[in-house]
A protein has these predicted regions:
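N-terminal Sec signal peptide and the immediately downstream disordered periplasmic leader
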Residues: 1-102, 108-114, 226, 281, ...
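Structural signature of Gram-negative outer-membrane beta-barrels, strongest in the C-terminal barrel
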Residues: 275-280, 392, 406-408, 440-599, ...
Length: 792
């Protein structure tokens, strides 16, 4: 199959299949020899070529024999191809056909099908990802803060959350790995990892054209294809996608003239070119380029309580807002990727994976969401990184080994202007801005190995370790300017930014022996992260496993530093798991995992001082807390008949605070419900004019906090219903899908801001900027969309 390309929205072209293929059979999709099942892909904007055409007669016969039975699902969680049921890791795997049947159109919807998982769009953005698994992640996307959940595209690490809310094309499967992945995947995977596994190009010239129309004037066009330049040897893949949708709401009032008033809209294009070379059966090369540009408007929040500085009422719709900033926003992503793979013999495979990524994101975030400049934050994010990885994977009869060397070099920089214009005017100035600029740059290398040894035909042991050495350099300029300042000239029409640096450097190194900071701060850390596991295969259908693993989130510097404060140590998670993976019958699968972990040296940004007086505030980053959690996860599949299948996923987590030096104090887990539940039903109707697949899905999330130190914004428990129907022609060339999301039009919070004070009686008072800023951002309302595609 053709290689996939990722954009900042997720679409999965449907794979053609015989009418005889069961849902579970299609979901598993064939995964070839390890040499042919892994391909590296660049980070955000990757489009794919068209999927392969109908299976041959033998495949149809095999599929017919498998109807009504569970099928083998293959995963690469341990960087080698193996059965899901034989992999001692808590994994949710969603195949390309299943993505299409459920109508999954964006990465954040994957959270519905994985227990104890949160994947949401970050606050005032359209494409920045907030990810938590088992309560471990990172909410603030500012440069310098490291994620707690790793995002990978065929083993290429996506370092920053900007642009990570991806749409997919022709992905073979998505794997959600729960629990620390510190041995094979390295830093910043204390919660787990999300993997995109894609296909390589094979076969003849293929094209795929797909169009989607839907609610809020959704109109998407995707054209992808592959051309064999030399038969079975050299392939050229190209793709283009244009994704558009009007806003779910609007900016009711914009203080600036000539602004686009769409709120929660979508406007994105992506393109790619890929060259793949197969010189022999044992040797493979690929080079790719991709680019994405997302010009969806900045997202305006919903005021949960009225402003005390304006007379603007709380809007009727949670998707309506007010702003005093420009409404434009941009995310630009561009990247290159390289892959070389050589199968030395039947037991040994060597691989090199390399990538270079660049991203630039100027954006406007109105924290107070009023027509006045009470608390406005225009900001820029500017990142680039290079990665290199060499792998050597050995597979013997009783012994296997995955090993490698990894190098990462990344620069993460930015600039934001916290404009407190109304407060500045009250002080007799034309305005007031706290400007912060800086960089947090990282260079790290790692060596890792994980071996598995079969002690007997039933008992296996696994032992792994990774050593990581990392150096970070950082500088911060931070200070007050008694005027309203924007990042560059013409940020708003007619604005001219003064020349030079407006605020002093406060974080760095004094190299001249005086009080002037003229070099970046430097810190180095190293971590040894082990894993020990034991697996017992009781019989062909049942495996018990237990493991201890460790992961860490990188140490860093405070990107909002106001003084020359030291860096903070890495966060460390020690996790224990026990579980069972069992096929109880040919039609019933049940996987259960119990886990507990200790989370030490939690990095926490605390705000000290008078919240209403920005000149008195001090934000310090500290290792300020230690927590623990325990929980359970259940995933079950029942193939009730040849054409009917049910899937259940349940997650539970119990949280404990063991040490709490945070200011304000820690009170709970952010964006993590105590209970999550999903029930999915899939029915395949076989007709003379093609297959029709009906899908119904119910998803439940318990109540949860938006912030870990405040209960002012929290979401009550809610349930969501999604319905889909997909038709595919007998020949497999035409397909169409009708999808209804959030059928009951539930309103649910996914982010917010709480710059407000509250007295003992529950009355709200002014916070930073002088207003009662309590803002919520919401998930998508009810939508309906129709997709029609043609392959040739």
């Amino acid at each position: 199959m053709s290689q996939s390309i990722l954009t900042n929205s997720l679409v999965s072209p449907y794979q053609p299949h015989s009418a005889a293929v069961s849902t579970e059979k299609r979901k598993s999709a064939s995964v070839k020899h390890p040499m042919h099942s892994l391909c590296a892909l660049a980070v955000a904007s990757v489009l794919s070529t068209a999927p392969a055409f109908a299976q041959d007669g033998q495949a149809n016969a095999d599929a017919e024999a498998q109807k009504g039975k569970l099928e083998r699902i293959e995963v690469t969680a341990r960087k080698t191809v193996e059965s899901l049921q034989e992999t001692p890791v808590a994994i949710t795997s969603i195949g390309a056909v299943e993505l299409g049947e459920k109508g999954i159109s964006v990465l954040t919807e994957v959270q519905q099908f994985s227990p104890n998982t949160t994947l949401q769009t970050s606050r005032g953005t359209n494409s920045t990802l907030t990810a938590f698994i088992r309560g471990l992640g990172q909410q603030d996307p500012l440069w310098g803060y490291e994620p707690g959940v790793g995002i990978y595209v065929d083993d290429v690490y996506i370092a920053r959350p900007q642009g990570a809310v991806l749409d997919l094309l022709d992905v073979q499967r998505i794997e959600v790995l729960r629990g620390p992945q510190g041995t094979l995947y390295g830093k910043n995977t204390i919660g787990g990892a999300v993997k995109y596994v894609t296909k390589e190009m094979t076969g003849d010239t293929q094209m795929n054209v797909e169009a989607t129309v839907g609610s809020y004037s959704q109109r998407d066009i995707k054209v992808t294809g592959q051309i064999p330049l030399i038969e079975d040897t050299v392939y050229l893949g190209v793709g283009y996608a244009n994704l558009n949708r009007d806003g779910f709401g609007e900016y009711l009032v914009s203080a600036l003239p000539n602004q686009d008033k769409e709120n929660y809209n979508k406007d994105l294009w992506a393109a790619r070119v890929t060259l793949e070379v197969h010189p022999s059966e044992d040797l493979f090369f690929r080079i790719g380029w991709d680019k994405t540009e997302d010009t969806s408007n900045a997202k305006g929040g919903y005021r949960l309580i009225p402003s005390i500085l304006t007379d603007a009422p709380v809007p009727d719709s949670v998707f309506d807002s007010y702003t005093s900033l420009p409404t434009w926003n941009k995310v630009e992503l561009e990247g290159y990727n390289w892959l070389a793979r050589y199968r030395v013999n039947d037991d040994l495979e060597l691989k090199y994976i390399g990538s270079h990524r660049e991203s630039y994101s100027p954006t406007n975030i109105d924290f107070d969401n009023t027509p006045l400049p009470i608390f406005d934050v225009p900001a820029e994010y500017d990142d680039n990184n290079d990665t290199h990885e060499i792998q050597a994977n050995y597979t013997g009869n009783a012994f296997s080994l995955v090993s490698g060397l990894y190098f990462y070099d990344g620069e993460s920089c930015g600039n934001f202007d916290a404009i407190l214009g109304v407060l500045g005017q009250s002080l007799g100035a034309s305005g007031l801005t706290r400007e912060v600029t800086g960089c947090n740059n990282s260079e790290s290398w790692a060596a890792y190995a994980q071996m598995n040894y079969d002690v007997t035909d039933k008992l296996s042991l696994s032992l792994g370790a990774r050593y990581t050495d990392e150096e970070k350099t950082a500088f911060v300029n931070n200070g007050l300017v008694f005027a309203n300042v924007y990042p560059y000239t013409d940020w708003i029409d007619g604005y001219v930014r003064p020349d030079g640096q407006l605020v002093p450097q406060v974080l760095g190194t004094d190299t001249d022996g005086d009080e002037v900071l003229d070099a970046p701060a430097v810190e180095s850390w190293s971590r040894f992260t082990p894993r020990v596991g034991v697996e017992y295969q009781m019989d062909r259908d049942t495996m018990f496993f237990a493991s201890y693993s460790q992961g860490f989130k990188s140490g860093t510097f405070n990107p909002r530093a106001q003084t020359n404060e030291p860096g903070v140590e890495p966060e460390v998670v020690d996790s224990f798991e026990v579980g069972v993976k069992s096929d109880l019958t040919d039609a019933l699968r049940m996987n259960i995992t119990l886990f507990s972990y200790d989370h030490k040296d939690r990095q926490y940004i605390g705000v000290e001082g008078d919240l209403s007086d920005p000149t008195a505030l001090d934000q310090r980053l500290r290792n300020a807390a230690e927590t623990a959690a325990k929980g359970a996860e259940l995933e079950m599949t029942w193939v009730a008949t040849d054409n009917l299948q049910f899937d259940v996923a349940y997650g539970y987590i119990d949280f404990e605070i063991k040490k709490n030096n945070a200011i304000p104090p820690l009170i709970g887990l952010a964006s993590t419900p105590e209970n999550t539940f999903n029930l999915n039903a899939n029915y395949l109707l076989e007709t003379s004019f093609g297959d029709i697949t009906f899908n119904a899905n119910y998803y439940y999330r318990d109540d949860y906090l938006i912030f870990e130190t405040s209960d002012l914004i929290q979401q009550d428990a809610y349930g969501m219903v999604n319905l889909s129907a997909r038709w595919e022609s007998v020949e497999g060339d035409w397909y169409a899908g009708l999808h209804v999301k959030n059928l009951t039009d539930e309103e649910y919070l996914v982010g917010g801001y709480d710059f407000v004070t509250q007295d003992d009686d529950g009355n709200f008072g002014p916070g930073l900027g002088g207003d009662t800023t309590l803002i919520g951002y919401y998930g998508d309302p009810r939508t309906v969309h129709l997709t029609v595609g043609y392959r040739f």
